[in-house]
Amino acid sequence: MFLMNASPVVALQSKWEAFGPPGSCRFPRCFSEADEGVESASVSARVQMLISTLQRDGAARGTSDERAAQRGHRAEGCHDARPAAKPTVHKEPPALAVCGLVADFDPMGEEETTDFGPLVLDSDSDDSVDRDIEEAIQEYLKAKSGAAQPGAGGAQPGAAQPSRAAGGGSRCKPEPAHGSAPTALCPPKLVPGSGGGPGSQVGSSKDQGSASPVSVSSDDSFEQSIRAEIEQFLNEKRQHETQKCDGSVEKKPDTNENSAKSLLKSHQEPPTKVVHRQGLLGVQKEFAFRKPPRLAKMNVQPRSLRSKVTTTQENEGSTKPATPCRPSEAAQNKGGIKRSASAARRGKRVMSAAQASEASDSSSDDGIEEAIQLYQLQKTRKEADGDLPQRVQLREERAPDPPAHSTSSATKSALPETHRKTPSKKKLVATKTMDPGPGGLDTDHAPKLLKETKAPPPASPASRSEFVERSSCRADTSAELMCAEAILDISKTILPAPVEGSDGSLSASPLFYSPNVPSRSDGDSSSVDSDDSIEQEIRTFLALKAQSGSLLARGESCPQAAQGPLLPPGLNSQTGGHKTPLSKTPDPLLGCKRKRRGGGHVRPSTPKKMQEVVKDGSQDADHSQGRAEPGHERRDLPIQGKASEALGGEGTARGPGDTRMSQGQGKTDEARRLDEKESSEDKSSSLDSDEDLDTAIKDLLRSKRKLKKRCREPRAACRKKVRFSTAQTHFLEQLGGLRRDWKDRGPPVLKSCLSKSKRDSGEGPGKKPPSVFGSTAERMRQEGAASQDAALAFRVRRPASASASEGNPFPRESQGPAPSPGSLSDDSSSVDSNDSIELEIRKFLAEKAKESVSSSEVQAEGPTALGTGGPARPEVLCRKEPAPPPGVCTRSQRARGVPHLAEGLRGTESAGAQGTAGLFSQGGKGLPAAPARGDPVPPRSTSGGVSAKGLSVSRRNVYVHKDQSPRGAEPAAKSAFGQLPSCATAGTEAGGARGTFHMGCGSPSFLTPSPGAERDAGAQADRTPPWSDFAHQSRLPSPWVLRSEGRDAVWRGGVGSERDKGSEGPARGLPSLPLAGFSPLLSTQLFHFGKGVSWGGRQAGLFSPHLGLPLQGPSFSAFREAQAGPSPVFGSPHLLAKKDGGPWPTRKAQAGLSLHDRRSSGSEESILDLRYRRRVNRDDQEQDALGSDASDFSDTSTEDSGGSSVVKV
């Protein structure tokens, strides 16, 4: 109403006036929300762009108007339910002038209307108002067509360029310049619009559009701007394609109906139009930036079609006054209109229909919907009867003709702009086409063109019939689609994306196919009347498409392959061949779009599709998923495999897809793993949340982009690269030095194994679930593996938890995404590869465990032991631990048990570094994600610089804790040092993870020092030989570090961190891995105990008795003895604390101890350095291997490791 009543004038004035004021004043609802200043600035910039665009692209605007007119025409036809109306309107030659004006008006008017359209849709929520607007628009269009036709002919020729120039310079003048016709058309509206010529109108509409959309959603505007940019790029890209396809497009119209011809003509002219449309697109994009997300998307998707339909609708209805701007724009664009005279005719004809349809589109009235539905049904039937063959022929002809123009093959003229826009719009259109359905429904050609453009795969007559029927179905569901679009826009990031996991992601993956999916679901769900047969046809087609898509998808494993293959084999034979490559052509564009859009828009369209699919597509989706799912699911898995897997229900249907996923496993795994990392790390706690799913989908889409590239690479390579790079590299990146050392020591094999296992693990569980389920299953399996294989279980468990998450991951997956495991199991290659990888990993880990045991025994301090500890760390103990801090006890127990097994294997290694490193690794690694951490852990274990490793591990732990914070590991890591309270448990985990798991265990219990002591006793007993000195240091660091770090220093952070750096760092650095890892661990655990002590000083009793007596007794006995000698201050935990802090029990005393201990740690550093100068040198050597100084890592990275949890957590 606002637009109808005052907005046109306001729109014209608002832009030229203060951009802000007019918007706010004139569009109270829409523009008042927007920031006038921002609007004016952006609008001014956009107006400039629009002016230049209009000047350059007058013809394009005419073309755009024609498109809008076409859409409007189609919409009108649909709205009026009179398919003959189009031809009649099209046949109106005088309408050309009017159309030129109208079409010319439309470009800016549409742009304005694009803004207005959203505004109208947003502002005019009353059906009565919408109906009134629609009626007024229709009447106005009729009157305008009659009145503007005479003057339009004269105004267009002479005034077109002047108003164009004037429009470029001052748009108010061109308005009079283009005068007579515009006056005829615009007199009532020129008055409102006269003040602001097209430019001002556009400005106002931009301003308004910007204002209201900006107020509506800056995110949407941003996304739309991204879309606009993407569309621009795609349009530029497709411009050439369109130009190429223009010939074919021109050829195709012959077979097409008049409407098809008009569409084709308007699209044939797009070479010029395309250029102009691109300008318009840029302008509209600008508008879209500010447009309400939904309408912006609508405008963005079929911008030339949908946007202009909506724009025309709203221009006519809401921006009737803005029509004068159109005349001025028409005058400006008349040159372009002359070029697109026929297009202008079509535009005019379509415009009348479009305006009527726009009213229906914008109003979304039940009556309009009914009219549109009726018309669409009639038209669909007629087209299905007669048009479909022609269109099918055209489509088939086009399929061969525009192979370069992938969409044109499926699209009538491949709608050059539609094709250009299709990549962006395909997604959007997939989304929007369902929504544009209302406006573009009666333009079954246009919707079909868009749909076909989107889904060129259905290039077959059946496909076309399906699309036609779907169009009618969409017409039926136009209101639903619009509502769904709005809902999807709102919830696009929530449920729709995940819901569409199978179909949606497939649709997202194959934009071409995705229209099919939505159209399928839409058609099936919406047009139950005629869609039952259509649905069956669609399902049959989709089944064929799914079969061919599955075959091709298996062959290509890329969405592109599935896109082309999705077409029925027979249908695809002609168009499929073209479309497959053609779809590939859009795929890069889509990839660019997805990259630019972050896949967000694909999701939006996909969610809509999924909504539709979920709505009624459930039948068709289930049916066609059953059939087409092979093709769909594969893509779905790569695209949203994780989300789909998260959608357990779809996961079942994805069984076939997962089977294919083995082929696309590289992609799917990568996507899953990436999503698993991101989502499991960031949102593993809220895997069930739609946002997380959306994020996972985004990640999956990103992964898919990467996978598309990697997809082209060998799948195995992709897996390795993907798995390792995503999961393991993710850790290894943080463990860069460790990873290098690990690599240096030959864990590359393990890496590959781990990569595979991780890859499989990621595949099996479906990333997020794997992180969650895999974590649990891995814990369970790892526990079992720990009992099965000690050192091997450590290593294998890490990889086995990865690889076991491959083999066992199936159980693990079965926990979460059983279908995925099933599909993976179905995927013999994945199962075989998983099993073989798991076996290889286990073998390699067993060998490496032996080597590590030998090397760590040789090294005693256990850089390798740490590495071994790394495997021990991967023990699910840690994972379990994150789940239950008491699990730290279990973890420590398991660390004790398994680590002790490993330690038993490791012997001195365990006693030395393994005890510390192993416990540390277990603690650090286990806590984060035993398997995931385990993977990097081997680098640690292998890598020298244990301190660096330990630090990295601690970081890793911290990081892992963060990653697993959803799991509670992050709190553990943070708690480890940062959150000492939970640190006692989580911190114990982190500390245990970080350092002495024994201590960690004891820490959770410091309470359970006996387990920790037990473990320390056992593991440290093993350590004791190598730890005699370490015992001093580790114990020294642990008691004083723990105590001072204890809750005090560490809790205090600065002192704790410093002291962790100093004491723990030195201890850690000094003992290198064993001590470095163990000291901080002890520090962490003693730290936890220290916390306990610092809490009350009872820790002196608790810590001393437990840690002091048990840990110090068994483990620290040597430590204590050695320490007592080497560091009197560190005589024993009690002695140490008491010596250092005298008042061990008191935190302040501990704080003093922290400082004192730090001093002691400094001296201890000296002492340890002196005592362990050799060890420090070893650490330095190892750390040098890591390329970092032990003390530096100890202080700095210890901050990260010991303090990592403390400081950096």
Curated annotation (Swiss-Prot):
Ribosomal protein: is it a keyword of this entry? no
Reading the lineage from the top rank, the first entry is: Eukaryota
- Cell compartments where the protein resides: Nucleus, Nucleolus
Describe the function of this protein: Inhibits phosphatase activity of protein phosphatase 1 (PP1) complexes. May positively regulate cell proliferation.
Instruction: Identify the keywords attached in UniProt to this record, alphabetized.
Output: Nucleus, Phosphoprotein, Protein phosphatase inhibitor
Pfam families cross-referenced by the UniProt entry: PPP1R26_N
Name of the protein this chain belongs to: Protein phosphatase 1 regulatory subunit 26
Spell out the subunit comment: Interacts with UTP20 and PPP1CA.
User: Which tissues express it?
Assistant: Ubiquitous in normal tissues. Expressed in numerous adenocarcinoma cell lines.
Q: Annotated region Disordered: where?
A: 57-91, 145-279, 291-471, 501-532, 555-694, 733-836, 848-1033, 1052-1072, 1118-1209
Which organism's genome codes for this protein? Answer: Homo sapiens (Human)
